[in-house]
Amino acid sequence: MSPTAYAIVETCGKQYWFQPGRYYDINFINAEPGDKIIFHRVLWLQHQQLLIGRPFLPNTHVEATILQHLKSKKVLVYHMRSKKKTRKKYGARQLLTRIYIHPFHGS
């Protein structure tokens, strides 16, 4: 495993920078903890050589394991209309999935 190995992967409508052997919090994925998932939409892979997709790399994938499901910190939204007695306070917590990225194999 190269210390500079990384991949840019598109999942859940966002692009993430993944390094092997680390864990990341991404948008909720509907699967059980312990399940293995495979990301096929790889945009960029730096492993033994640099591979750039146009837009995606064919026959390339990144494997991960779901560690747990969690919620993000609460985001508060406060809506107030000046000179009126209208005040509303909303709070929301995003559902997240913590994943572990497995080491990359051959390109």
UniProtKB/Swiss-Prot annotation:
One of its GO terms (cellular component) is chloroplast. It is found in: Plastid, Chloroplast. It comes from the Eukaryota. GO terms for biological process: translation. Its main location: plastid. InterPro entries: bL21-like, bL21-like_sf, Ribosomal_bL21. NCBIfam families: L21 (TIGR00061). This protein binds to 23S rRNA. Belongs to the bacterial ribosomal protein bL21 family. This is Large ribosomal subunit protein bL21c. It comes from Cyanidioschyzon merolae (strain NIES-3377 / 10D). The gene is rpl21.
